[in-house]
């Protein structure tokens, strides 16, 4: 069994540059913990003193620049608390940000790109540029890691999956070009589709929201583990295999339903809970509420 804690003084800095140790930036995290808000305000004034008065052309984002910054800083902190070596994958092109999507409840937009670039220029973030088919990677640089180390902010005060929609509709797999067919063994990605609610989607969302609320009130653990993760072998490209870590922290409790090929009649399976990835050997060790 593991206990939530802070990285030790000796282990609070990044020591590995493995960009495969990463996860996507989570745009559905939030917290109003006072000490964290103080850090947000301090860094905002330091690095973006005139941002709120800047007038930009084009339609205005529903989320302020400061909300973008706070969400980014919060997920960087959660990532660092999980593993100081871990990176976050981020879109650095405007097309990767859909502010009005139902799958982006905080309405974050391509404003995030400018904020990331400024923090990289100020050596607040480490940055690894993405290659074809991969996202760019960021993580807290040493000066930000030092601030995180001194921040007494328990992850239990973070709201995960904030306003996140648990009902997802995906389209058909994108058609590969000839080169992709020859060089890649990855499954083709299905695009996420926008949709209009129906009485049935509203009903399904209500059921899942209640289920996820129940999960958030419970403590889920694997008593035989000394660290908050387990590893499973996952095939990557060609014959190469890699152990992939699945964390059993609160950010991996959210359960969603995914429908396929643009139809509510196809798919509908449940995904998201870390317990769905656990081995049969560890399954008997799952513990609820100690």
Sequence positions of predicted segments:
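Helical catalytic core of nucleic-acid polymerases
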Residues: 27, 44-45, 49-60, 64-67, ...
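Acidic, glycine-rich two-metal-ion catalytic cores of nucleic acid-processing enzymes
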Residues: 128, 135-290
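Pre-recognition alpha-helix immediately N-terminal to the DNA-recognition helix
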Residues: 70-75, 114
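Long, low-complexity, charged/polar intrinsically disordered regions in eukaryotic proteins
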Residues: 2-65
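A short, conserved structural fragment
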Residues: 116-133
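Generic recognition of stable, solvent-exposed alpha-helical segments in well-folded globular domains
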Residues: 110-114, 203-206
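Charge-rich, solvent-exposed alpha-helical interaction surfaces
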Residues: 39, 115, 207-210
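Extended repeat-based interaction scaffolds and adjacent low-complexity, acidic/S/T/P-biased segments
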Residues: 5, 72-73, 88-90, 118-119
């Amino acid at each position: 069994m593991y206990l939530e804690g802070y990285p030790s003084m000796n282990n609070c800095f990044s020591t590995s540059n493995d960009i495969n140790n990463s996860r996507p930036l989570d745009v559905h995290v939030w917290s109003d913990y006072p000490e964290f808000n103080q850090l947000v305000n301090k860094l905002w004034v330091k690095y973006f003193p005139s941002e709120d008065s800047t007038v930009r052309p084009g339609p205005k984002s529903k989320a302020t620049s400061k909300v973008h910054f706070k969400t980014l800083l919060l997920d960087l902190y959660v990532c660092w608390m999980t593993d100081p070596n871990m990176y976050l994958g981020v879109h650095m092109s405007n097309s990767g940000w859909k502010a009005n999507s139902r799958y982006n409840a905080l309405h974050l937009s391509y404003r995030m790109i400018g904020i990331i670039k400024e923090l990289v220029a100020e050596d607040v973030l480490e940055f690894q540029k993405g290659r074809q088919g991969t996202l760019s990677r960021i993580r807290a640089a040493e000066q930000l890691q030092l601030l995180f180390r001194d921040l007494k902010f328990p992850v239990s005060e973070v709201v995960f999956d904030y306003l996140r929609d648990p009902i997802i509709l995906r389209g058909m797999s994108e058609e590969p070009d000839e080169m992709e067919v020859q060089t890649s063994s990855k499954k083709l990605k299905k695009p996420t589709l926008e949709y209009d609610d129906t009485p049935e989607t509203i009903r399904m969302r209500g059921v899942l929201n209640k289920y996820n609320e129940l999960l958030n009130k419970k403590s889920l653990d694997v008593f035989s583990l000394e660290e908050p993760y387990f590893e499973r072998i996952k095939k990557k490209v060609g014959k190469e295999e890699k152990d992939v870590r699945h964390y059993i922290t609160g950010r991996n409790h959210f359960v969603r339903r995914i429908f396929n090929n643009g139809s509510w009649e196809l798919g509908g399976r449940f995904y998201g809970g870390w317990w769905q990835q656990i081995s049969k050997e560890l399954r008997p060790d799952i513990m609820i509420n100690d």
